[in-house]
C-alpha cells in the first residue's frame, strides 16, 4: 500500500441511499470524503435512485424490486453506474417508475413490513447479483457502513467484509438500537430482538464504531462494550458581514416528529409574552407538504409559512434573523426517539452569529448539548419558554455571550476539516489493521 493509500485508503461505502448533495446524508458524506480522489471511493446502495452528484464515479445498486424478482430469477444482476451515468442535470435522484406506490407502502415502518422486507432479502439472490464481483474489481481497503434499521444491510456489510478480507467501520447517524418505535405493536418486540441480534453481531465485528455526538458515544460504549468515536456534523464556518439590526425569529427545516406543534406553542408564547422587541410573527421555512403536519403551523395567526427555499439562501435567512429556533417534542414516544440524535442543522446555526432559541426536553441529546455549552437560549418547559423569550430580544449582553459561546463551540467541534480528519483517521487505522 502506497503512502497516499495509507492516508486515503480505497473506501467502499455501504448505505441505503445514493450519495446526493441535496440530502442530509449526501451533504454529510461530501464533507467526510472531500479529501479523497473520487476514483478511490465506490458506493453500494439499495434505494431506487440514480447518481446525480459525482461524489464518486463507481456505484452498484441492488434494489427492493431487484431482490423480489431475484427470488425467481436467481441470477438477476444489480446495476452498475459509472461517471458517464451520473445525471448532474437532475435535481432529484429518485427513480421510481410504476413502483412508487408499492415502494412507499414498503417504507411504512411497521413490524410486519420490517419482517417481510427482511425476509424478502433473505430469500433473494443478492449474493449472486454481481455485487461481490463488482466490489472485487474496485479493490477496496476498507468498508464504511452507514448503519440503518433493516438487518439485511448489516448482513451485506459482513458478507463483503468476509469475502474481500477487509475491515469495516460503522457510523451510527441515528439511534436504531435503544429505541423501538413498534414495541407496543403486534410482533414489535420480536422484530426488534431479531434486528438487534444481527446488529450486535455486526457491531462486534467492526474495526471501529463512530457516532454523531458524545451522548450517543457514551451510551453505546456502555451497551456494546466498545470504545465509540465521535464525528460531529460539520458546519459552514465562513464569516458573514455584521448586520447592525438583526430582526425576526425563524425556523428552517423538518416539521415532523412533533416540531409543528412545538412551533405553534412558541408562536403562542411570543404573543402572550410581555416585553419589547418580541416579533409579531414566527417565520417558518420548510419543504413539508403533508396537510396534517402543516395544519397547526398554517392555522396559527402568529406564524408566517414560507414553504421551501433554495439551499443557498438558508444561511442568509438565518444570518439576518435575530433568533433561529431548534425544537424537539415533549411527546413521550418522540422524546425517546430523538434522545440520542443531534440535528444536522445545529452546526450551521452555531456558526451563524445568530442567537439560538432551543425549546424541548432537557434529556434530548441536542438540548443537552446546547445547555451544557451555554450555546443557546434554552427552555425545557412552557413556563421557562415564556420567561426566556423577553431576555432573548432585550438582554444584549447575554445575547452576545451566548452567540460567542455558540461560535466557539462550532469552531471546536464542527469545523469541516476536523470532521474530515476524524473519518479519514478512523478509516486509515482500520485499513492498517487497528481495532478499537
Model-predicted regions and their roles:
Residues 258-261, 312-314, 324-350, 356-368:
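Nucleotide-sugar-dependent
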Residues 236-238, 242-297, 304-312:
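Conserved catalytic-core segment of nucleotide-activated headgroup transferases in glycan assembly
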Amino acid at each position: 500500500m502506497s503512502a497516499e493509500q495509507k492516508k486515503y485508503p480505497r473506501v467502499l461505502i455501504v448505505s441505503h441511499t445514493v450519495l446526493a448533495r441535496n440530502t442530509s446524508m449526501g451533504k454529510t458524506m461530501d464533507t467526510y470524503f472531500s479529501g479523497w480522489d473520487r476514483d478511490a471511493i465506490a458506493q453500494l446502495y439499495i434505494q431506487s435512485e440514480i447518481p446525480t452528484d459525482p461524489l464518486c464515479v463507481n456505484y452498484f445498486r441492488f434494489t427492493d424490486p431487484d431482490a423480489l424478482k431475484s427470488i425467481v430469477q436467481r441470477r438477476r444482476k444489480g446495476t452498475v453506474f459509472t461517471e458517464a451515468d451520473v445525471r448532474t442535470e437532475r435535481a432529484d435522484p429518485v427513480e421510481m417508475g410504476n413502483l412508487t406506490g408499492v415502494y412507499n407502502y414498503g417504507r411504512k415502518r411497521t413490524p410486519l413490513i420490517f419482517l417481510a422486507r427482511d425476509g424478502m432479502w433473505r430469500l433473494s439472490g443478492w449474493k449472486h447479483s454481481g455485487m461481490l464481483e463488482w466490489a472485487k474489481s474496485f479493490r477496496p481497503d476498507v468498508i464504511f457502513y452507514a448503519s440503518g434499521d433493516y438487518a439485511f444491510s448489516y448482513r451485506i456489510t459482513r458478507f463483503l467484509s468476509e469475502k474481500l478480507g477487509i475491515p469495516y467501520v460503522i457510523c451510527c447517524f441515528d439511534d436504531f438500537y435503544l429505541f423501538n418505535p413498534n414495541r407496543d405493536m403486534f410482533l414489535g418486540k420480536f422484530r426488534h430482538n431479531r434486528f438487534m441480534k444481527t446488529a450486535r453481531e455486526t457491531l462486534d465485528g467492526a474495526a471501529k464504531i463512530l457516532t454523531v455526538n458524545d451522548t450517543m458515544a457514551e451510551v453505546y460504549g456502555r451497551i456494546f462494550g466498545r470504545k465509540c468515536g465521535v464525528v460531529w456534523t460539520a458546519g459552514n464556518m465562513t464569516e458573514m458581514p455584521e448586520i447592525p439590526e438583526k430582526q425576526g425569529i425563524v425556523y428552517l427545516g423538518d416539521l415532523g416528529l412533533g416540531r409543528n406543534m412545538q412551533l405553534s406553542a412558541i408562536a403562542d408564547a411570543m404573543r402572550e409574552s410581555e416585553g419589547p422587541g418580541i416579533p409579531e410573527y414566527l417565520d417558518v421555512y420548510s419543504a413539508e407538504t403533508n396537510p396534517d403536519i402543516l395544519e397547526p403551523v398554517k392555522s396559527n395567526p402568529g406564524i408566517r409559512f414560507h414553504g421551501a427555499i433554495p439551499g443557498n439562501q438558508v444561511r442568509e435567512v438565518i444570518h439576518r434573523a435575530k433568533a433561529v429556533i431548534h425544537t424537539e417534542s415533549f411527546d413521550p414516544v418522540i422524546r425517546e426517539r430523538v434522545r440520542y440524535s443531534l440535528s444536522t442543522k445545529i452546526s450551521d446555526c452555531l456558526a451563524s452569529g445568530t442567537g439560538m432559541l432551543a425549546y424541548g426536553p432537557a434529556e434530548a441529546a441536542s438540548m443537552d448539548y446546547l445547555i451544557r455549552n451555554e450555546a443557546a437560549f434554552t427552555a425545557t418547559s412552557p413556563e421557562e419558554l415564556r420567561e426566556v423569550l423577553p431576555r432573548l430580544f432585550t438582554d444584549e449582553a447575554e445575547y452576545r455571550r451566548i452567540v460567542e459561546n455558540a461560535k466557539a463551540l462550532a469552531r471546536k467541534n464542527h469545523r469541516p476539516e476536523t470532521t474530515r480528519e476524524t473519518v479519514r483517521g478512523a478509516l486509515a487505522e482500520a485499513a492498517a489493521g487497528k481495532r478499537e
